[in-house]
Amino acid sequence: MDQFEYIITLEFGNQNQVESAYQIFKSIPKKLKAKSIGEESIKSNNQDWQDWRVCDLEIDMITDFKNQTSKEEESDLITSQYLGHGIIRLFKLSNANNTLNEKEILTIPGDDTMICILFVPTYFTVHDLLHFYIGDDIVNKQVSNFRILRNQQKGMGFNFTVLIKFRNALDAKNFKEEFNGKSFSRMDPETCHVISVKEIVFQKKLFQRPAANEDFPYLLTDPFTVKKKKELVKVELPTCPVCLERMDSETTGLVTIPCQHTFHCQCLNKWKNSRCPVCRHSSLRLSRESLLKQAGDSAHCATCGSTDNLWICLICGNVGCGRYNSKHAIKHYEETLHCFAMDIRTQRVWDYAGDNYVHRLVQNEVDGKLVEVGGSGDDDNNDIGNSDELQNVVYGNRSKNGEKSNSNKKDGELAANFLRHREYHLEYVQVLISQLESQREYYELKLQEKDQTASDSSNVESLKKSMEDLKLQFQVTQKEWQKREMAQKSKLEEDMLVIEGLQANLDHLSKKQEQLERENKALEESKQDLEEQVKDLMFYLDSQEKFKDADESVKEGTILIQQPHGAAQASKSKKKRNKNKKAGK
């Protein structure tokens, strides 16, 4: 947050008082500082002061006696000295504005700290809006400025627009998320519409800048339409008309109402009245008169254009002529079943379903039943206009239901009649609003059901068509699949036969191969046996030929032939054969 500096200026009636005050301030200890002391432009010394702030000026100083060498220690002494007769002004160092050409289009870019509440109903007072709806915490801690604008454009209705400038962008974002779409009250279906202000574009200055030598500059500068400033200048802080304290948007929130008077937010909250504390401007009275004037000029039947015996539908606002004319109001009921209609001239409410008047029905506090109020009291006429709350109910309810009147006298009589029976009228307003709300919800539910039924029927028809198409596609696909299945089955049978033949051949060949392997093995064994026998026979013949002439000892000897280690079994078998041969000999 930026740090600001303030300047105190003392304005006196003559030069002697200025010099005297200056000498007094020079003698003050360094603890007390005065930024500037001077004489403002005064036409004459004997000029009559026109400012309510003019008074006798005195300065209080604290004298320290603790450093004195006295036995008894004295406390600090507060002394006062008269300066003169004048005004104390408090200035704030602010940034100077850049000179702009009024003929050119000016664009003031936003900094995401400004939001706007659109279409605030006219029955909301400033106190209700700030204190009850927005809340004291937001008003006192987050908001720097409020500005309330009234809409008087034809066709847009009579309502208010509230500009709110926050101290930082995060608070503005949180405010928009919390209040956008929030209902203004339980009995009013209207909701709060909060938008962010991106920039402000205008062709001329919104307010005329005050001259540098004027005593009361207008609100320092307008926080909603002034760019960021660069040069520092002195600007006097204005005072709040309610509490007479200085108004600074950096320390407390400020609110500007439609009559362009500015106050502290907490001061206006304490002023529980719809009128301005300065000029007594009442937004409710002006909006009501404007609404009645606009409605009286444009009241006519929506079908035939008749201006006599008009009835307005309380459900949708349709205006039609009565049963003594072309009966367009009754036809509207027969077409839409909107059973409540109000006579624009007398403000009486007729129930087409019950075929009777219901504008005098209130809710009994004992058992909650609807009872009819009879008779009229003779209350004092001085009660008219004394209660802002009743004016809010009467005028706000009439402006909301779009009533139309051509005579101010009849309007006054109607208002007097409402205020004579204030309790009954409050009950009537609550009951009527609740009944209308239930009617609105009922018919909205019926319309939603009708739309849902129509959409469901169209969806069913489309689903039926798609179902038929899918059935045809399924039948075609099923036939193709059956053909493919038969072909695949025949092919599968052929393949199975081939596989069975191949498997039989494979088994036969396997058996034949095993038989051949066994025969081959037997032949190998017989071959080896025959080879050994031939070898033994050849050895026997050779040895017999060699040893035929030898001695008996040599003939009876044994011949050993060394064989490899791996052929042990073969040698054993050979020995057995040799023994067998010898035994045979």
From Swiss-Prot:
Bias (Basic and acidic residues) ranges: 400-410
Zinc finger (UBP-type) residue numbers: 277-377
Ranges where the record places region Disordered: 372-410, 552-585
Covalent cross-link site, Glycyl lysine isopeptide (Lys-Gly) (interchain with G-Cter in ubiquitin): K369, K410, K450
Organism listed in the record: Saccharomyces cerevisiae (strain ATCC 204508 / S288c) (Baker's yeast)
Official protein name in the record: RING finger protein ETP1
Keyword list, A-Z: Cytoplasm, Isopeptide bond, Metal-binding, Phosphoprotein, Ubl conjugation, Zinc, Zinc-finger
Main location: cytoplasm
Positions of RING-type zinc fingers: 240-280
GO process annotations (BP): protein ubiquitination; Ras protein signal transduction; response to ethanol
Chain's role: May act as a cytoplasmic retention protein with a role in regulating nuclear transport. Binds nuclear localization sequences in vitro. Needed to adapt efficiently to ethanol, either as sole carbon source or as cell stressor. Involved in ethanol-dependent transcriptional activation of several genes and ethanol-induced protein turnover of some proteins.
Coiled-coil intervals: none
